[in-house]
């Protein structure tokens, strides 16, 4: 089913997957991440952090956008209606698309992601899919996030990468993000994991107690 939402599925509906210019403003990328933060009740990173990422990795830090051209989507839906295909549903979608043009203009970014491409000199080339966000209030049934990963995978193959790393998964595979990643039938590498070795037990105890409290306070402030 996931494969259905790749390639021609998005192209025919007016969605293109573009790479942002390295000098582009990051506010739109951060806005889309913010939509995911609110939806999932998590806290990611601010704009300053991503500026540092760009500075550190240069043109290897690639930001992708799933960009919807609503006029092309309108043409696509009008074509289906003219062929008498699922008229009630496509008429509803057409009305929705026209309303979006009135509200947001012809071009809308549905989702975004940040991928770090590997050093060309590296022996093992791994593209790292680090962050992603999407605005599910706009045409969520088009599954733009799937297309973003597909675009990143295609570019990583063209760059001669050995792997496209989607990041870690929860041990139970029951969390939302793990369920999304599993759709791509990944090869899962199991490592020992992470551990903490306190060098100052008093400071570490304070860190263990205060950090959860700080996170809760930040969530309350954002709400």
Language-model features and meaning:
Residues 105-110, 122-186:
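Acyl-donor binding region in acyl/amide transferases
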